[in-house]
């Protein structure tokens, strides 16, 4: 038998064997038809058994989420190039809910809300997926917030402390430095063993590119995931982005890690949900927002928590950002988020215009649970700082009318101006705990009161530099201690006196009691 005959015989034998073992398998597919398509949404008919929130597959590898499930039609939020679809196109059920890839392979990557890479580092390496919408941790699985999250910003760490597992709202008018505070907080986690997730919702591509460049230049991208929903993307992307980012952060939390997530910003998220709801003809409410706008944010932010040790003790800290209009923090969405979160950091455009950066309005900012997590040594040196600063602001306003003040009031104003000047901090320059404590002790001891305002920044830098020359035994004792001993405190005071001596000038060289705040 020739080789050709052997090949033919073998092929026929294999065919005969397969005929005896082959069993036809039928797979049922439920197919619907697009009735209409508009900006980011579609109406679909013919899917009688579809479930709410189920993922539907359209032609061209476009997906959507079933939002409105009515008797005759389904309102679908589209997650892709909706302009490629038209009436009459087929729609197929997938039988699953929207999920996203999770895992350590996502760190250092830039992805979209569907988990697709937006950078040039190749495909995402991850074998695990989690649903985008997940229930928050049960109450009995949660632990109290007891560990501080250091932001590296004096004004926050000392006066408005944040704890790991807390939800702290950052709000203010546009261009007041909200994103800067969040990014500086991420930069300060480089040695804190905290993983970070930055979720850009409806942001300009140029602004996101600038943020990514800062993270990359400072080495923060190594422990950070960036999820981007661009402003020109369909509103469905902006809607699911924070939920998808939270699922990724929850994966790390459930592995016992401490995670920080930034939502930048939830104003765009609320507007995207309002747009989708109006397109799907859901009844509008106040400011045309749907009635469940509070619920979509509460179920998102309730996922931030601190887990008990029996659940590996991880934590998820949320920093949602929201934009106000004309300093109106009593608008609908801001009041909703203030009531949901554990405190807020308000950025004042007035302070921003005066060059006081970060422009945190201490009087209108609060942290409801972070104070319990703040390191005791902070409380010891900054306990009266907020009250002193509030008294200063009141007296300064009074002094602008030309009123004559007694010596005690003049001393309060002199000290208050130094506090305000010290709370200024350049962008991308987080401070260590030792540097902050040293500056705060010098403030409370009024060692800066004879330093001219124009030299405050230079004097503070010299004081921070002096802390690097402290001996190793002091640093070891400082890092392990909860409360600063009297000897160590006196040592810091002595160093501050020596360091600040060259910058001091007579009190009458100040800028005057009734002058406006210095830049």
From Swiss-Prot:
Q: Where is this site: Required for activity?
A: 365
**Entry binding sites for ATP:** 172-179
Q: What GO molecular functions are on record for this protein?
A: ADP binding; ATP binding; proton-transporting ATP synthase activity, rotational mechanism
Q: Which reaction(s) does its UniProt entry say it catalyses?
A: ATP + H2O + 4 H(+)(in) = ADP + phosphate + 5 H(+)(out)
Write down the top EC class of this protein.
translocase
Claim: Membrane is one of the keywords in the record: yes
Q: Which CDD domains match?
A: ATP-synt_F1_alpha_C, ATP-synt_F1_alpha_N, F1-ATPase_alpha_CD
Q: Which InterPro entries match?
A: Alt_ATP_synth_F1_asu (IPR017710), ATP_synth_asu-like_sf (IPR023366), ATP_synth_asu_C (IPR000793), ATP_synth_asu_C_sf (IPR038376), ATP_synth_F1_a_nt-bd_dom (IPR033732), ATP_synth_F1_asu (IPR005294), ATPase_a/bsu_AS (IPR020003), ATPase_F1/V1/A1_a/bsu_N (IPR004100)
Tell where it localizes.
Cell inner membrane
Q: Which PROSITE patterns match?
A: ATPASE_ALPHA_BETA
Annotated function: Produces ATP from ADP in the presence of a proton gradient across the membrane. The alpha chain is a regulatory subunit.
- Protein family according to the UniProt entry: Belongs to the ATPase alpha/beta chains family.
Name by which UniProt lists this protein:
ATP synthase subunit alpha 1
- Gene it is expressed from: atpA1
